[in-house]
Structure formats: C-alpha cells, structure tokens
C-alpha cells in the first residue's frame, strides 16, 4: 500500500500552525503629570495628549487632572479607560460621603481612600499612576504619589507618566536641592515662582518625550479653591 507523503499534499491541505489573537487588557496612553507643594498651596501640571500606545495620537485635548473637592485634585497618567473608571468611582464615593456627613472629605482622607480603592483592585488593577494634591486641614500643601496597586507616600513633589524620568531630576535638583554643594537656608518660594518652574519642567519633558505635548493644564490649589490655567506645548 502506497503511503501518502505530506509533501505530496496540496499546499492548502497541509496543517498550518494555529495562531491565537493575544488579548491585551491594558494600553498605556502616555502623558506626564507632576506636582509641587508649597507652604500653603499646590501646583499641579498635566499635558493633554493621549496617544494610542505607539506613534498615533487619539486626541490632543484630554485633561489628566480631575477636581475632587475645592481643596484637592487627582492627576493621573496611564490608561485612559481605567482613569475614567477610577474618577467615576471616586466621585460617586465622595458625593455619598458628603451627603452622609454634611461636609466634604478631607484631603488626607481622600488620599487614603484612593489607596484602599487601588489595593482592592490589585488582582486586576486600574492601569493608572496617580498623584493626589491639595491642602490639608491646617492649610498646608501636600502631595501623595501612588503605584498601580495603592502603595503611596506623602511628599512635597512628584511626577508620574511617560515623562517621569525626565522631570524627576529637575524636581530633585530645584525643589529638594539634591546634588548642590551650596544650598541656601530654607525659604518660602512663592506660588508664582513654582508655577513658572512647573511650566518649564513639563515643557522640557514635551521636547524629549513623544507621548507628552499639545497643551498643559496648570492647576493651583490653595485656601481659596482650585484655579486652572492652560498653555501650549509642542504640537508635533
């Protein structure tokens, strides 16, 4: 009996390797957020570019800063869909808290609640990297910085996102005064000076990071509330 060889079969009848479409649950839409806290204020910045994870730009007008209360904002980079889901959850819980207690949640309490929320989702986490910035009950400016599963730290400056490695050295040098041989004594820096520095920082990140650009939102949080400003970055 003649044996049929595989090589004798028509090309269409040969068994082809089975390929599976890989499901990617997450995409990093890029962008940069940063914040600097002063004695009685916080300055937060975030660009408005949303990329598709590659070289495409999906929109140039996506704000990464979300106001939580009159004394607190959330700045987020990462996946836009998860960012929106997280914002909705926080907004719902803050509204419920205010209705039940008759007052808005304090900034430190919001920071802890966000940590709990992210940790609760740790087995399928929100692909978001967050900064909570605002003033506390004593009127002092603070920032809380997070990883994706809720580990957080209270600091005076921080950044997140695709331009993080470009911005952090500037913040280390100019805010914390690291790697300087001669450091002046502690002195209060005006909010206007910090705003100018933050603008320069995110502009610098936009020149080197293709996922950061178009426009930047600058937000100042102080005892009088939340104040917004927008300025243009590179558009290419």
Swiss-Prot record:
Coiled-coil portions? none
Q: One GO biological process from the UniProt record?
A: proteasome-mediated ubiquitin-dependent protein catabolic process
**Alphabetical UniProt keywords:** Cytoplasm, Nucleus, Proteasome
Q: Does the keyword Nucleus apply?
A: yes
Cross-referenced Pfam families, in alphabetical order? Proteasome (PF00227)
Q: What is its main location?
A: cytoplasm
Gene Ontology CC annotation, any one: cytoplasm
Spell out where the chain crosses the membrane: none
Localization, UniProt: Cytoplasm; Nucleus
Q: Which PANTHER family match?
A: METALLOPROTEASE TLDD, PROTEASOME SUBUNIT BETA TYPE-1
Q: What does this protein do?
A: Non-catalytic component of the proteasome, a multicatalytic proteinase complex which is characterized by its ability to cleave peptides with Arg, Phe, Tyr, Leu, and Glu adjacent to the leaving group at neutral or slightly basic pH. The proteasome has an ATP-dependent proteolytic activity.
Q: What does the sequence similarity comment in the record state about its family?
A: Belongs to the peptidase T1B family.
What does the annotation say about its assembly with partners? The 26S proteasome consists of a 20S proteasome core and two 19S regulatory subunits. The 20S proteasome core is composed of 28 subunits that are arranged in four stacked rings, resulting in a barrel-shaped structure. The two end rings are each formed by seven alpha subunits, and the two central rings are each formed by seven beta subunits. The catalytic chamber with the active sites is on the inside of the barrel.
Protein name as annotated: Proteasome subunit beta type-1
What is the species of this protein? Dictyostelium discoideum (Social amoeba)
Q: Which gene encodes it?
A: psmB1
């Amino acid at each position: 009996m003649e044996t049929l060889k595989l090589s004798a079969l028509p090309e269409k009848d040969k068994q082809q390797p089975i390929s599976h479409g890989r499901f990617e649950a997450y995409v990093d839409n890029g962008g940069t957020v940063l914040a600097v806290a002063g004695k009685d204020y916080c300055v937060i910045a975030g660009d408005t570019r949303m990329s598709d994870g590659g070289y495409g730009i999906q929109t140039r007008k996506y704000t990464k800063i979300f106001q939580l209360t009159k004394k607190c904002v959330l700045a987020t980079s990462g996946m836009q869909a998860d960012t929106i889901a997280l914002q909705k959850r926080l907004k719902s819980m803050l509204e419920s808290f205010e209705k039940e207690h008759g007052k808005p949640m304090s900034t430190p309490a919001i920071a802890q609640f966000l940590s709990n929320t992210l940790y609760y989702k740790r087995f399928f986490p929100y692909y978001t990297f967050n900064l909570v910035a605002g003033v506390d009950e004593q009127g002092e400016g603070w920032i809380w910085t997070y990883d994706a599963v809720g580990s957080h730290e209270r600091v005076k400056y921080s950044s997140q996102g695709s331009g993080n490695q470009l911005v952090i050295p500037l913040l280390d040098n100019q805010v914390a005064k690291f790697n300087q041989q001669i450091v002046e004594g502690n002195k209060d820096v005006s909010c206007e000076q910090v705003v100018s520095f933050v603008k320069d920082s995110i502009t610098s990140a936009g020149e080197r990071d293709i996922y950061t650009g178009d426009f930047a939102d600058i937000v100042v949080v102080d005892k009088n509330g939340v104040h917004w400003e927008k300025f243009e970055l590179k558009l290419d």
